[in-house]
Amino acid sequence: MAKDIKFSADARSAMVRGVDILADTVKVTLGPKGRNVVLEKSFGSPLITNDGVTIAKEIELEDHFENMGAKLVSEVASKTNDIAGDGTTTATVLTQAIVREGIKNVTAGANPIGIRRGIEAAVATAVSALKETAIPVSNKEAIAQVAAVSSRSEKVGEYISEAMEKVGNDGVITIEESKGMETELDVVEGMQFDRGYLSQYMVTDSEKMVADLDNPYILITDKKISNIQEILPLLESILKTNRPLLIIADDVDGEALPTLVLNKIRGTFNVVAVKAPGFGDRRKAMLEDIAILTGGTVITEDLGLELKDATIEALGQASKVTVDKDSTVIVEGAGNPEAIANRVAVIKSQIESATSEFDKEKLQERLAKLSGGVAVIKVGAATETELKEMKLRIEDALNATRAAVEEGIVSGGGTAFVSVLDAVSGIELTGDEATGRNIVLRALEEPVRQIALNAGFEGSIVIDRLKNSEAGAGFNAATGEWVNMIEAGIIDPVKVTRSALQNAASVASLILTTEAVVANQPEPASPAPAMDPSMMGGMM
């Protein structure tokens, strides 16, 4: 395929046009008074959203060179979303500001490499200053504040803070669609896995079709149990204690399953059997998790253990187990807290080194199950369009809250960027590097300027007053008042703020140092096929 190539100023100006088109579309959503953008979908109703990364991903431009510029900014939004889960619109605004100021200077004859070094030095200083001013987030009220600011809903803030309190900061919090119109929170405490009872005759509550086991022993094995004789000595030992038994095995079939069911029906023995969760190596890891949580041992040939030799000491224990046809929940396992903490630490290190998103997600699920439970926020809305928009907002809020817990918070509304201006301007640089620093100084004002503009105020006036205000003061764009941002609950996570700046500077620097752009030439349209003369008989 033939290529179309542009060089130097032509290349950069074409890409900048794409940057501006995407950024101008996204930045109208910034702040509490940000507007919505309507996205056409190939089927179904249009999506109305103010989520920066969702909008950025939808933009595709006809001109190949402009499209490359737009896609680079979209990459900034996506990367910021991946790292911090929020701040995508801020990152887009910062990218446009750095590119716009940078291009002016490069066109005027400045060296792009020198400008890039200045930008990098300024951003490193700004990030250090942001981290120094960070306020730790630890209590429920602060978590609710962060979530409420991100989602623009105090109710959502309450749900997220309550969920994090119940399942821990590392716990799994999922967002699902509710069957009703109300948004609600559902918390499953303890370890849950998606395996139900192997026979409905094992239930203890025939109305709800669930099996409740109080203070049970738990047999954990990766073997298939087909012969009841293999576990008969163990069953006799448990029978003497008059406690129920949960069997977690690869499978229970042959004569073993009907024998267990028969004893359950007769009231001789309260037992429930379920299949082990997961597959392959993941199954082994999950069985080990269950064993550590309950203080038991996995009966496996890998450890040289046989079912026939298993004793009551090898069994796990829990205060309660609930099993329905689809899932099993183990509450308050009797495992050693130190062993559980060590296992959690191992899984955390595996998450950090995982390269696959799928592996990372599965490891986080295991971590949550060991840490204390799963919370589900069920989103309700009057229409499908509203439901989609609400889900996106809650996802952003959840990510922002986790980021805040991780690295702390700073004052919101873009004021944190303005607060580091003195630190950045204090860097001693010369020549083009000083120009790079000045570009960042101008860009750091842009989020506040855009938030004010979206709320119907003059951005330059807000910036001037902010620079002359005392530390902590800022402009509340929602009300048009000047307030102490932290006290007013207008806050941003440090991780979101610094990720937006770092990613914006990285991609903007690449655009400024671009000297050639290579694009595919559009293929000419195929000519229409000639009409067959034999089909023109009636026209002569």
UniProtKB/Swiss-Prot annotation:
Residues annotated as binding ATP: 29-32, 86-90, 413, 476-478, 492
Cystine bridges: none
InterPro entries assigned to the protein according to its UniProt record, in alphabetical order: Chaperonin_Cpn60_CS, Cpn60/GroEL, Cpn60/GroEL/TCP-1, GroEL-like_apical_dom_sf, GROEL-like_equatorial_sf, TCP-1-like_intermed_sf
Domain of life: Bacteria
First-tier enzyme category under EC: isomerase
EC number in record: 5.6.1.7
Cited SUPFAM superfamilies: GroEL apical domain-like (SSF52029), GroEL equatorial domain-like (SSF48592), GroEL-intermediate domain like (SSF54849)
A molecular function (GO) term: ATP-dependent protein folding chaperone
Subunit structure: Forms a cylinder of 14 subunits composed of two heptameric rings stacked back-to-back. Interacts with the co-chaperonin GroES.
Family as reported in the entry's similarity comment: Belongs to the chaperonin (HSP60) family.
NCBIfam families with a match to the protein in the record: GroEL, PRK00013.1, PRK12849.1, PRK12850.1, PRK12851.1
Family matches, as HAMAP family: CH60
Name of the protein: Chaperonin GroEL
